[in-house]
Design a protein with these regions (language model features):
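Non-catalytic cap/lid and distal C-terminal segments of serine-dependent acyl enzymes
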Residues: 1-140
Length: 140
């Protein structure tokens, strides 16, 4: 792994995909790219999807909320594709809404709607996401 930010790649699904986006958007100088698969990217309240009370207050949660971070940092993500959003299992609506928001904000991103897969690390999505993070897969 490179020490520079472009060598620090984030990959996750479900809440860890949400976390990958949140990390990159909060620390764009530290991380290069983030890929999320079947993630609740538009989660707008603390405690949803099993996140419990880890954020504490609603004000604290606001500092991690992906939709707010996209809006606040759009200008920093318009030139180079650093956000990757692929496939779905149970969060297709969240992906569609995140994609629409990124389009509206003119954020450069890779979006693939599908294929639908089981909400699991072993359902076959990791290879495609890793290839996209590494720039090894052409857009189909």
């Amino acid at each position: 792994m490179k020490a520079a930010s472009e060598g620090r790649l984030l990959l996750g699904f479900s809440k860890s995909g949400w976390g990958a986006y949140s990390l990159l958007l909060r620390h764009p100088d530290l991380f290069g790219k983030a890929a999320a698969w079947d993630a609740p990217l538009m989660m707008d309240k603390s405690g949803r999807y099993g996140s419990g009370d880890i954020f504490g207050t609603d004000d604290n949660f606001a500092g991690y909320r992906v939709s707010k971070l996209l809006e606040d940092n759009a200008a920093n993500f318009q030139k180079e594709t650093r956000l990757i959003l692929t496939g779905y299992g149970g969060f297709r609506d969240e992906h569609e809404r995140a994609h629409e928001l990124m389009e509206k904000l003119k954020i450069a991103h890779e979006y693939r709607d599908g294929p639908a897969r089981k909400h699991d690390w072993h359902s076959g999505w990791v290879k495609e996401a890793a290839e996209l993070l590494l720039g090894r897969k052409d857009k189909e």
